[in-house]
Amino acid sequence: YVELWAHEVKTPLALLTLVLDNRRDTLPEAVGFKLDYVRNRMQAFIDQMLYYARLRGARRDYRFERLALRSCIDEVLDDYRPLLEEKHFRVELRLADETVFSDRRGLCFLLGQVVSNSVKYALEKPVLAFSLENGGTATVLSIRDNGPGVRACDLPYVFEKGFTGDSGHEKNKATGMGLYLAREVAKDLGLTLTAASDWGAGFAVRVTFPVV
């Protein structure tokens, strides 16, 4: 059922993409931006549904290979550009050239859920910072925002399915699925996800890649 639903929804999404690709020069800039925004939101919801169904199935279809981590991050930021621009994010990249062993599609989905979470809870003058630590046995990617953060009592549950916590007015719009799906995909990819936060001072997710 999920796959059928996604297939049906992708038809109008493909039409919207075609219009944007072929008619962008004739559209007012504000209209093009809004259509980009809607398209990316629709695609994000479809991806979440498909990954949820995929995680519950027997087949995963991952393809592990050496990946340039910066390339994956750039791809995710490009996908989320309309949402980041809508909230006026400043993105900081403090990254050395680093390769990791993973599945590109799965890794990009995981990173996208973290970015989406930061966008959802953004405050004024939002910042999204990516940094990298390279140790002897692991490479750690940190993704930090300056949003409202998470209370200490809630922090152990941020990766639980359906958990929305208490992070301001966006709580009622949250599904509690993004970080849950990120953690489940991370498990499949052999990665570790951890979260850190000070209430009122931002939220960070650390993705640990074992060195292989």
Where are these regions (language model features)?
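Short conserved segments within the C-terminal catalytic ATPase subdomain
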Residues: 83-93
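Short helix-loop "hinge" at the ATP-lid/N-box region of the Bergerat-fold HATPase_c
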Residues: 118-119
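Short beta-strand/loop element within the Bergerat-fold HATPase_c
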Residues: 125-137
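Acidic ATP/Mg2+-coordinating residue in the GHKL
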Residues: 145
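Short conserved segment of the HATPase_c
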Residues: 150-163
